Amino acid sequence: MHLKAFGKVNLYLDVISRRKDNYHNILTLFQSINEHDDIFIEFSESEIFESEPPLNISWDNNIIKKSIETFKKETGFDNFNLKIKLIKNLPMGGGLGGGSADAAAVLNFLSKNFKISEKDLFEISCKIGSDVPFLLKGGTAIGKGKGEILEFLEPLKLNIQIYPMNYNIDTKKMYEKLDQNWKSINHFGDPYNLYEALKNNDIITAKQNAFNVFEQVAFKEYPKLKQKKEDMEKDEGIIFALMSGSGSTLYKVIYAN
């Protein structure tokens, strides 16, 4: 079976506070994008995984394997193996949720085959990664907590152009940079105001509320990202440009319907 694992951008992303479990509370506006990985998957006598191009992480550390193992543990359906071929189109470490999208696609495949409830599948996804719960369904949603507290909204119809940059940014490192510089970090905008502005083609309000807190640390580490974003903001017809996730992918929103 051929699965499409659609990525996401964060139209708004702020880090609100650090949690006792060493994670962070975030506030974000998730938006699905057309860009996706392709996954060819079938049940098999033995576990087989291959990727084009080859990944720079081992299978044991792959979030797809984590999703399969977590599914087996949580459901008790553990007497199966999968043959998976991943065509990796979304950039690694790019902020588009590529690995999480792959995990979500495989979970949806397993859920349909083993008839797992939506509630149970959601709970499994929360154990795998912060973006996985949203990517199970996709569309447009406000995310809170670690990203797993979701408020799905009427999907926005946006023209989003993606600009992958040649930096594999470590999310953990970016959170550490935020923590180290917390007192000097600025927070502004509102994801609900941004959503309404994009829904109603209110360009001025959209510009005022589009925000990614990670730009304040990522742009110091990678100055070329800042320069590229500033160049993009000069483009004709643009509503706003932003970095997605903890980086490094940049994107621009051209118009909203």
Curated annotation (Swiss-Prot):
Involved pathway(s):
Isoprenoid biosynthesis; isopentenyl diphosphate biosynthesis via DXP pathway; isopentenyl diphosphate from 1-deoxy-D-xylulose 5-phosphate: step 3/6
Q: Quote the Pfam families the UniProt record gives.
A: GHMP_kinases_C, GHMP_kinases_N
What is annotated as the active site?
A: K8, D131
Per UniProt, which keywords does this protein have? ATP-binding, Isoprene biosynthesis, Kinase, Nucleotide-binding, Transferase
Instruction: Mention one GO biological process in which this protein takes part, according to its record.
Output: terpenoid biosynthetic process
Binding annotation for ATP: P91, M92, G93, G94, G95, L96, G97, G98, G99, S100, A101
InterPro entries with a match to the protein in the record? GHMP_kinase_C_dom, GHMP_kinase_C_sf, GHMP_kinase_N_dom, IspE, Ribosomal_Su5_D2-typ_SF, Ribsml_uS5_D2-typ_fold_subgr
Give the superkingdom in one word: Bacteria
Q: What general EC class does the enzyme of this chain belong to?
A: transferase
In the UniProt record, does the keyword Nucleotide-binding occur?
Answer: yes
Q: SUPFAM superfamilies given for it?
A: GHMP Kinase, C-terminal domain (SSF55060), Ribosomal protein S5 domain 2-like (SSF54211)
Gene Ontology molecular function, alphabetical:
4-(cytidine 5'-diphospho)-2-C-methyl-D-erythritol kinase activity; ATP binding
What EC identifiers does the entry list?
2.7.1.148
- Chemical reaction(s) catalysed: 4-CDP-2-C-methyl-D-erythritol + ATP = 4-CDP-2-C-methyl-D-erythritol 2-phosphate + ADP + H(+)
Q: What does this protein do?
A: Catalyzes the phosphorylation of the position 2 hydroxy group of 4-diphosphocytidyl-2C-methyl-D-erythritol.
PANTHER family xref list: 4-DIPHOSPHOCYTIDYL-2-C-METHYL-D-ERYTHRITOL KINASE, CHLOROPLASTIC (PTHR43527:SF2)
Family statement drawn from the similarity comment of this UniProt entry: Belongs to the GHMP kinase family. IspE subfamily.
- What protein name is recorded for this chain? 4-diphosphocytidyl-2-C-methyl-D-erythritol kinase
> What's the source species for this entry?
Petrotoga mobilis (strain DSM 10674 / SJ95)
